[in-house]
Amino acid sequence: MQVLVRDNNVDQALRALKKKMQREGIFREMKMRGYYEKPSEKRAREKAEAIRRTRKLARKRAQREGLMSNGRISALR
């Protein structure tokens, strides 16, 4: 990964590098590889993440359609 340093502004270059690494998911990858994860634990984690994504998408769809307001399902009258 490469970041240009302009006008000897190292702080700005570090912020840009950190933002790129965050976008690429490098910090998350480093955290996950910090210790061994058993294959069964990996499957369970990935399944839980998929469920979380699905629920989040369903919430967004419901909110877009006007069925929800502020995270709660409004009563249909």
Curated annotation (Swiss-Prot):
Similarity section: Belongs to the bacterial ribosomal protein bS21 family.
SS bond partners: none
Family matches, as PANTHER family: MITOCHONDRIAL 28S RIBOSOMAL PROTEIN S21, SMALL RIBOSOMAL SUBUNIT PROTEIN BS21M
Region described as Disordered: spans on this chain: 55-77
Gene3D superfamilies assigned: Ribosomal protein S8 (1.20.5.1150)
Biological-process GO terms, alphabetical: translation
Annotated source species: Bartonella quintana (strain Toulouse) (Rochalimaea quintana)
InterPro entries: Ribosomal_bS21, Ribosomal_bS21_CS, Ribosomal_bS21_sf
Entry-linked Pfam families: Ribosomal_S21
Signal peptide: none
Gene Ontology terms, MF aspect: structural constituent of ribosome
Protein name (record): Small ribosomal subunit protein bS21
GO cellular component: ribonucleoprotein complex; ribosome
Record keyword Ribosomal protein present: yes
Keywords: Ribonucleoprotein, Ribosomal protein
